[in-house]
From Swiss-Prot:
Highest taxon listed in the record's lineage: Eukaryota
Protein name per its UniProtKB record: Cytochrome b5
Topological type in the membrane: Single-pass membrane protein
Domain Cytochrome b5 heme-binding as annotated: residue spans: 4-80
The keyword tRNA-binding is assigned to this record: no
Cysteine disulfide links: none
Described purpose of this protein according to its UniProt entry: Membrane bound hemoprotein which function as an electron carrier for several membrane bound oxygenases.
Family (UniProt): Belongs to the cytochrome b5 family.
Residue positions binding heme: H39, H63
GO molecular function, one term: metal ion binding
Alphabetized InterPro entries for the sequence: Cyt_B5-like_heme/steroid-bd (IPR001199), Cyt_B5-like_heme/steroid_sf (IPR036400), Cyt_B5_heme-BS (IPR018506), Cytochrome_b5 (IPR050668)
Transmembrane segments: 106-126
Length: 135
């Protein structure tokens, strides 16, 4: 494996140009400058992964064992993990199944609909009953 020097992410970030390109993958720092032109995905893929932890980018592709072996030759040191920002994931806030504040409003609206409907039904029933009894 390559050198044992420890770099900060700020130091690695200074190497993000086509003529000087370093990547952080799996806690190691790699100088991939000479490989930019030979990379099957093109130089832009590697350049877009500079100045950050590119481990997820690398693993998502599913590189071959020969690609991983090539990395050993490009290793220039380790990354100081305390300089890499922690990944935050979005966790939606927990909400009740119903909005407790709006439940009374829902009941009021339901009653505003049902009470006139019941009154109308009773009025029609009384009229129908009176019509039947008069015949």
């Amino acid at each position: 494996m390559g050198g044992s020097k420890v770099y900060s992410l700020a130091e690695v970030s200074e190497h993000s140009q086509p003529n000087d390109c370093w990547l952080v993958i799996g806690g190691k720092v790699y100088d991939v400058t000479k490989f930019l032109d030979d990379h099957p995905g093109g130089a832009d893929v590697l350049l877009s992964s500079t100045a950050k932890d590119a481990t997820d980018d690398f693993e998502d592709i599913g590189h071959s064992s020969s690609a991983r072996a090539m990395m050993d030759e490009m290793c220039v040191g380790d990354i100081d993990s305390s300089t890499i920002p922690t990944k935050t994931s979005y966790t939606p806030p927990k909400q009740p199944l119903y909005n407790q504040d709006k439940t009374p409003q829902f009941i009021i609206k339901l009653l505003q609909f049902l009470v006139p409907l019941i009154i109308l039904g009773v009025a029609v029933g009384i009229r129908f009953y009176k019509k039947q009894s008069s015949d």
